[in-house]
Amino acid sequence: MHISVLLEEAVDALNIQKGGIYVDGTYGRGGHSRLILSRLDKSGQLIAFDKDPAAISEARSILDERFQAVHSSYAGMYTALQSLGINRVDGILLDLGVSSIQLDEASRGFSFRHDGPLDMRMDSSRGKTAAEWLTMASETELKEIIRTYGEERYAGQIASAIVMEQARQPISTTLRLAEIVAAVVRKRGHRDDRQHPATRTFQAIRIHLNQELEELSMTLPQCVELLNTGGRLVVISFHSLEDRIVKRFMRMQTGTDTLPRRLPIREEESRLHNQQKLRIIGKKIRPGSDEVSANPRARSAVMRVAEKLETRNAISR
């Protein structure tokens, strides 16, 4: 069962206006979407995106004229909303990463605990599977991807072992890949009872295969463009690579890093100088101990919130 992380906190952070237009960029299994809908009146709208066909199939079971489900990555959000006649929205939620259902269904090929075909595609209707990609990946490419996207200290040794085993017999199942990786990590004497030895390698291959970081980087500017003044952008990330992108983007959009401190200029002049488009709302939020106890996968979640500012073309004096 998929449990939405930071459910109340995320929807509260959107600061829902009853008649507003909202976007759930990652429908998953609809926890956030259903709560958003419960806070809208009859004139409100919610558009949900997901590139997983199974998620969209579930979303289309919601029979509510205020709700539309779009089979697309959130990276296609701007174009899709334009085609629906929507130019501006009042809030956008991005709940990044993989859903519990995707992880737990062996047939989806994300799990290093349950045996299944080595797939790992978020959108199972297109693109190469992880097994197909491994047949073409060089050791150098594998090492770079595992090191960059998995932040795995044994990337070189893992890549070498994968290529060696691949030459012996193509790796086509999740447990075989997990066993190859785990053998390398354990041989190095590294042990972390909180994390499976293959976690970082599986994360790296999944991120690369689904272009997760590229899509996130493409999507964040679209969100700023789409938001009405006062609209909120809420992003929940699950690993440091995602969170760094979100944090850096939000800080850049505040413009606070580009002027020397203590300059004697008015706030509105500073904002115009830096083309400030967002203001950060509060500090990052993590799940509480009760939520982590109930849903251990929530432990790495980080939520950041920003609000769209009014843009000005000139400074009034």
From Swiss-Prot:
Its EC number is 2.1.1.199. Pfam families: Methyltransf_5. InterPro entries: RsmH (IPR002903), SAM-dep_MeTrfase_MraW_recog (IPR023397), SAM-dependent_MTases_sf (IPR029063). One of its GO terms (molecular function) is rRNA (cytosine-N4-)-methyltransferase activity. Belongs to the methyltransferase superfamily. RsmH family. Its main location: cytoplasm. S-adenosyl-L-methionine binds at residues 30-32, 50, 78, 95, 102. This is Ribosomal RNA small subunit methyltransferase H. It comes from the Bacteria. NCBIfam families: 16S rRNA (cytosine(1402)-N(4))-methyltransferase RsmH. Keywords: Cytoplasm, Methyltransferase, rRNA processing, S-adenosyl-L-methionine, Transferase. It is an enzyme of class 2 (transferase). It catalyses: cytidine(1402) in 16S rRNA + S-adenosyl-L-methionine = N(4)-methylcytidine(1402) in 16S rRNA + S-adenosyl-L-homocysteine + H(+). GO terms for biological process: rRNA base methylation. Specifically methylates the N4 position of cytidine in position 1402 (C1402) of 16S rRNA. It is found in: Cytoplasm. Gene3D superfamilies: Putative methyltransferase TM0872, insert domain (1.10.150.170), Vaccinia Virus protein VP39 (3.40.50.150). The gene is rsmH. GO terms for cellular component: cytoplasm.
